[in-house]
């Protein structure tokens, strides 16, 4: 395993540096033994892009992960002593307000050290963008327009407002940030 070789090399070199990684919750590194090795090699922070706390939404996004894998990866990293950052998005295709509330509950249940809550923006070249165009959720190809006529006041495509408008998405995102960072247990850390 290449990761083992890299970690062993860092341990043997005894450089005294710390570092961070971004990883998938479904990776082979998401076990206690590997997380402990990463920590010993100087890894002190790990980032996980989970995106949703609803399996149906994760499947629609084709993330190829499960909520159980996310829970396990965060737990393993925490047990190893790492700082854990998680990432979640609101406004995904077919995501309802109730799903966003479930995502917030899931994020809180993980007890990660940090969480970033963002609003989904479909970008050109992604399957999400192409599908939103095909389904009429984006009215026209904004990126093609920009590529053919770059202007300084370009605005990215509208959000996918299938089940929630921008005002609702912003309110949910702000609520998520408040609830995550103003928990008594979080404040007392």
What label would you give each PLM region?
Residues 7-188:
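A structural motif corresponding to the C-terminal lobe/cap of the Radical SAM core domain
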């Amino acid at each position: 395993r290449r990761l083992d070789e890299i970690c062993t090399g860092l341990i043997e070199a005894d450089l005294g540096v710390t570092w961070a990684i971004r990883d998938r919750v479904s990776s082979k590194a998401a076990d206690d033994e590997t997380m402990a090795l990463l920590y010993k090699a100087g890894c002190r922070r790990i980032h996980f892009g989970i995106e949703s706390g609803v399996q149906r939404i994760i499947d629609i996004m084709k993330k190829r992960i499960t909520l159980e894998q996310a829970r396990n990866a965060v737990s393993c990293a925490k047990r190893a002593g790492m700082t854990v950052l998680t990432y979640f998005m609101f406004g995904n295709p077919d995501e309802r307000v109730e799903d966003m509330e479930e995502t917030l509950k899931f994020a809180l249940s993980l007890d990660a050290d940090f969480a970033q809550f963002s609003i989904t923006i479909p970008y050109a070249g992604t399957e999400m963008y192409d599908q939103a165009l095909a389904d009429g959720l984006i009215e026209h190809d904004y990126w093609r327009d920009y590529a053919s006529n770059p202007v300084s006041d370009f605005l990215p495509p509208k959000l996918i407002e299938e089940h929630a408008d921008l005002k609702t998405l912003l309110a949910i995102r702000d609520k998520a940030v408040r609830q995550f960072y103003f928990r008594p247990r979080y404040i007392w850390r």
